[in-house]
Each structure stands twice: as structure tokens, then as C-alpha cells.
Regions:
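Acidic/His/Gly-enriched intrinsically disordered linker/tail segments
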Residues: 67, 142-159, 187, 201, ...
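Alpha-helical solenoid repeat scaffolds, predominantly canonical TPR units
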Residues: 424, 458, 496-499, 503-506, ...
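Beta/coil-rich, acidic/histidine-enriched accessory regions frequently appended to metallopeptidases
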Residues: 46-48, 306, 340-488, 495, ...
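Canonical positions in the second alpha-helix
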Residues: 428, 461-462, 507-510, 545-546, ...
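Alpha-helical adaptor scaffolds
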Residues: 444, 478-485, 492-497, 508-545
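Structural marker of alpha-solenoid helical repeat scaffolds
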Residues: 431, 465, 513-514, 549, ...
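TPR/TPR-like (Sel1-like) alpha-helical repeat modules
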Residues: 499, 571-587
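Juxtacatalytic substrate-recognition/specificity segment
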Residues: 45-59, 66-230, 234-241, 296, ...
Length: 604
């Protein structure tokens, strides 16, 4: 592990431990899986013996089904890749991303988590496809956006605009108004009258979006300015065969290759601007007030349209100053500030307490840091004669209609366009596609649309085909639970053994897949609470597993405590009640735990 101390971009040797000690970035290591004990419930899931008849979708208007779209498909660790760029361009972009992914794992170990539900990486290379994934409310004629993350629960997608090479921006920084027109060809350049625009580097935008994706999945989530600042730092990370450098900023006096070529040729005019580091981007701009910087939320236009924006570059400058500025001497105050923001709002009083500066003082500090950036660089250096690890080859093939429909449909659903999502998913289904993952996706779409009849059939079929999608098993279990609740087979509204098995079977499948879902464990507890069968201690071990994964989910903690009382494990119940009282934030929740505590026999 090596570092460089920079003054006016002249490196000298030094050492530091590259670590990210912020509490809300520390990913909790999950406990090992407990074995699933069947016990008296080791019965066959009776639903597997029932023949399934899948629903029929009928085209009722005069329009024909849209023709199949040519896309490529591939997989890398943690991602399904869907691209309509050329095969060569896709392999180049994904191969570069794999190197970035591997480099990030070396300098920031533990931040990348494995999941059975891979994130979709959608590369839009032609046909203006990127715009179809922009959520309603974020669409604007002068978008400064070339990438976006779509997320809901465990489902997520990163979408990259690989078609647009230049965005013509109408910004407060002085660009003249011009309508952005994307080129029809993949490698085209979009230019508009009067505004030279900003170059779009899809590679760097993918780096940025991936960091924002990682940080957006951490709880409690950090502030938007911090996510953007860290993303900008890693967007500029340099990776070679032997070295990874984090935190280095460019020489602000350099010009782009395109501008240099124009100058050398004696051609007047301005080339499209590059998306530069903060020391160049902010050199001639008015800074935002610190209160303005901190007020921007994750879904604000400034955060979603960061390309060329002052907010993004000032966030970059402030985070870089806090982590690397003046040889890293501000790190302690900066990290203290971040930790305090977990539990209190950003105020000038808090800021002064941490940094011993007012907001206005910090603007002068940032201005000075932009003009003369004295900082420490961090990184990794391979040993003498060695090279850093290289990623495995990336295989690409033509995507099936089912893969295209499922991946696009899921992303469109995440973007809020349910109608387009249904069209994308059902079109390949009507043509005969029966891929288990597609069936699961359609089932979840219909479930969200409250069409439980269709949803049940698709989810049953997906479960029989062993689809890898824990949410599908959870929703199937919820429908079976509702069915058993409506018609309990035992007295006192209790579930029979068969009904209990029917509910628990998909839940136990879901818990073998990642990511773990708190709702899975909550429904397991509820099923036991309704069952005629008293669970054994081995069965309740599954609930202990859930509490280890989700110690702050008070509904799960409470339900587990109730079941512990039911089987006589009073000491375990007391520990769970103590946990619930520590983490509960609502008065009524605390009262529930207190009532349960009062019902316990006196401790001996």
C-alpha cells in the first residue's frame, strides 16, 4: 500500500492505510447460514403436484406485436449485461468496467456484496433507448445526465447512455440554450448551435454511477453531497497493470485533445468541454453556499443531472479536501461531521463545532483549495516484478427475447412506467418464451398491479422452475398465507400442518437466496404463530438467523420473542426484548415490548 503527498502536483513518497472508516459505509458481515431443519414439517410441497395452467395474454387492438429488438447479453460477477451497442464497443466498455470493479475491491475491500439477484447493467448504444428509462419527473429537455441508477428493494439497474457523445447544456454556468439531439449512430456526436456542450465519457459515467449505486444501498444512507464527492473521486481513479491511484486531480492548465487539435489547425471555435476535476471546473465559477450544497437531496435535479454542474464539482472539492487535503489532516474532523449527520441535521452550528469554521470561512477554504490543491494521494502498488490481478474474459452473445423483455421490463417498472414494462415482458411471453426468470418477473409485475389471479399462476410456475428471485417466493408465500388465513383448516383459526408447509416452503427457498429479506423472516414467524404445530428450537433457529441479519427490524425482533415465549425459551425472549427496547424509535413499539416483558415470569 503506497501513497503520494502532492504539492502543486509534484509527487513524493509516503505511506498511508487506505481505509473508509465511516460507520454508515461499514458493511455488516452476516453470520453463517443455519441449516434448515424440516422436523415434523418435512413434507412435500403439495403445490408441486398440481398441474399449472399459465394465463393467456390477448392482443385486442389492431397493432401488431413490436418486432424483436437485437440486444447482446452477458454476465459478470454481480451483473447481467444487456447492450444494444456494437459487440466490440460493449466488450470494451464492460472489460474496462471489470478492471475498475477489481481495482475497487483492492482499495475498498468489502464494499461490493454478492447477491442472487444480479444488478442489470443496460448499455444503450443506439435508437435513443436511454431516454425511455428516465423516470417521470426527471425528464428534461436539457438533461445533464448520461447514466442513472434505478432501485427498489433488492432489485436494481444501472443504465448507461453510450450513444450520446456530447450533451448540449443550458446551465447556470453560462451555456447558451440549445436542444439536445442524440446522434442516430452509435459513435455519432451531438452538437447544437451556439453551445459546444459537454463531452460524455461513458466509461467515467459508469464508474460514477456504480459508486453511487453502492453507496445508495448502504443504511443509513449518507448525504447526497458525500455520495457525489466520493463518486467523483473514484471516477478519476487511475488503474494500470501495476498501480491504482485514488484521489489524484488533474493539472488545471491542460486542454482537451480536441481543443488542442483545433488550435493547432488554426481553426477558431471551442471544442466540447470535458467533465473535468474540481480544480479546473470551479476555477472561474461562483461557489454555492455551504447550506445550498448540503440541501441537495439524492433525487434533486442537481444530483441527477450532475454532468458539468457546480454542485457536483463543489461536492467533489469538499469531500476531497476532507479526505486528502493538506496531507489528510482534516480527516478526523470530516469523519466526525459525517458520523454526526447520521443522527442530526446539517447546521452551521454543527459545522463550526466539527471544523472550527463558519460556512463562509469554508467557502474561502474551498476557493483556496481549488486554486492550490495540496493533498495526499492513496493507492495500491504491485510488488516488484508483479502485476495487479486481471479480470476474466467477458463472454457476449445475442440475448433471447425473454432476457430482453425481463431486463428491460424490470428497469422500466423501476422507472415507474408500468405500461411499458408490461409490454416489454409480455411480448416475449406471447411469442412463447417461458424462461423461469421471465415468469417470476411477470408474476411480480402482476402482483404489484393487484392482479393476484395472474400473479399466483406465474409465481407458482416460477417457483416450480426454481427461479432465482427471493422476492418471487416471498410474494407467493404471502398469497398462500392469505389463502390459509381466509380458510384455516384447524380450530381457533389455526393453520394445519399442510397449510403451514405450503407457506413455509417458498419462504425457506427464499432464505437460501441472497440478498436476505427481512419480510421473509417476519412471515416465517407469523406462519408459526398461526400454525397448529408448536415449532421446535431448531425451527426457531431460522428466526434467530433473521434477527442477526436485521437486528433493527423491530417487528421481526418482537415476533421472534413471542415465539421464544411460546416454546418456553424465556431467557432468549428477555434478550430479544432488551434488543427491541434499545432499537425501537416509536412509543407504541416500545410499549409492545414492555407489555411482553411484563408478561414473563419473574427471573430466578
Amino acid at each position: 500500500m503506497v501513497a503520494w503527498n502532492n504539492a502543486a502536483a509534484r509527487p513524493s513518497c509516503g505511506h498511508m492505510n487506505l481505509s473508509w472508516p465511516w460507520r454508515f459505509l461499514r458493511l455488516v458481515a452476516a453470520a453463517g447460514w443455519l441449516a434448515a431443519h424440516g422436523g415434523s414439517l418435512a413434507a412435500q410441497d403439495v403445490s408441486k403436484d398440481k398441474p399449472l395452467e399459465l394465463p393467456t395474454y390477448t392482443v385486442t387492438d389492431s397493432r401488431e406485436l413490436p418486432p424483436p429488438e437485437p440486444w447482446f447479453y452477458g454476465r459478470i460477477p454481480g451483473f447481467e449485461v444487456l447492450s444494444n451497442a456494437s459487440e466490440k464497443s460493449t466488450k470494451r466498455l464492460v472489460g474496462d468496467f471489470q478492471r475498475f470493479f477489481l481495482a475497487l475491491s483492492l482499495v475498498w475491500p468489502g464494499v461490493q456484496q454478492k447477491t442472487a439477484v444480479p444488478t442489470s447493467l443496460i448499455i444503450c448504444g443506439r435508437g435513443g433507448k436511454f431516454d425511455t428509462f428516465i423516470p417521470t419527473g426527471q425528464q428534461r429537455p436539457n438533461r445533464a445526465m448520461a447514466s442513472l441508477t434505478l432501485r427498489a428493494a433488492e432489485q436494481s439497474a444501472i443504465v448507461i447512455d453510450f450513444q450520446t457523445k456530447v450533451l448540449n447544456l443550458s446551465t447556470s454556468e453560462g451555456a447558451t440554450a440549445a436542444v439536445s439531439t442524440a446522434a442516430a449512430a452509435e459513435d455519432g456526436v451531438s452538437l447544437g448551435g451556439g453551445d459546444p456542450g459537454f463531452q460524455v465519457d461513458a466509461y467515467r459515467q459508469l464508474y460514477r454511477e456504480y459508486i453511487r449505486f453502492l453507496l445508495g444501498g448502504v443504511e443509513p444512507r449518507g448525504p447526497a453531497w458525500f455520495e457525489e464527492g466520493v463518486a467523483q473521486i473514484f471516477m478519476a481513479m487511475e488503474v494500470t497493470n501495476t498501480t491504482i491511484i485514488v484521489g489524484k486531480v488533474e493539472n488545471p492548465n491542460t486542454i482537451s485533445a480536441e481543443q488542442g487539435a483545433l488550435n493547432d489547425a488554426g481553426i477558431s471555435g471551442t471544442a466540447p468541454a470535458e467533465d473535468r476535476d474540481f480544480n479546473a471546473a470551479l476555477a472561474k465559477r461562483r461557489l454555492l453556499g455551504m447550506d445550498e450544497l448540503f440541501a441537495v437531496t439524492h433525487d434533486a435535479p442537481e444530483a441527477n443531472n450532475a454532468l458539468g454542474g457546480t454542485w457536483a464539482k463543489q461536492a467533489y472539492a469538499f469531500v476531497h479536501w476532507g479526505l486528502y487535503g493538506d496531507q489528510g489532516k482534516h480527516q478526523k474532523a470530516f469523519i466526525t461531521f459525517l458520523r454526526r449527520l447520521d443522527r442530526e441535521p446539517a447546521t452551521e452550528a454543527l459545522f463550526k463545532e466539527c471544523f472550527k469554521q463558519s460556512y463562509q470561512d469554508m467557502l474561502f477554504t474551498i476557493r483556496g483549495y481549488v486554486e492550490f490543491t495540496n493533498y495526499k494521494i492513496a493507492g495500491v502498488q504491485a510488488g516488484k516484478g508483479e502485476k495487479l490481478p486481471t479480470p476474466p474474459p467477458f463472454e457476449l452473445r445475442e440475448a433471447t427475447e425473454g432476457e430482453v423483455g425481463r431486463i428491460k421490463g424490470d428497469a422500466l417498472r423501476l422507472a415507474g412506467d408500468v405500461a411499458a414494462a408490461r409490454t416489454a415482458m409480455t411480448t416475449p411471453y406471447i411469442r412463447g418464451e417461458r424462461d423461469p426468470q421471465l415468469l417470476a418477473a411477470i408474476g411480480l409485475l402482476e402482483r404489484a398491479a393487484n392482479d393476484d389471479g395472474r400473479a399466483r399462476k406465474f409465481l407458482e410456475a416460477a417457483a416450480q422452475a426454481k427461479a432465482a428471485r427471493p422476492r418471487a417466493y416471498l410474494e407467493l408465500a404471502k398469497m398462500r398465507f392469505a389463502e390459509a388465513t381466509a380458510k384455516p383448516a384447524e380450530t381457533q383459526a389455526r393453520f394445519s400442518a399442510e397449510q403451514t408447509v405450503a407457506v413455509l416452503t417458498p419462504l425457506f427457498t427464499a432464505r437460501t437466496q441472497t440478498p436476505p429479506l427481512a419480510e421473509v423472516y417476519e412471515l416465517i414467524a407469523e406462519a408459526w404463530a398461526r400454525s397448529i404445530i408448536t415449532p421446535g428450537t431448531d425451527h426457531l433457529g431460522v428466526l434467530d438467523e433473521g434477527v442477526r441479519f436485521f437486528p433493527r427490524t423491530t417487528a421481526l425482533v418482537y415476533a421472534t420473542a413471542v415465539q421464544k415465549v411460546r416454546v418456553g425459551l424465556v431467557a432468549d425472549a428477555r434478550s430479544l426484548i432488551d434488543l427491541g427496547l434499545r432499537v425501537a424509535t416509536e412509543a407504541e413499539t416500545r410499549r409492545k415490548f414492555e407489555r411482553l416483558q411484563a408478561s414473563l415470569p419473574a427471573a430466578k
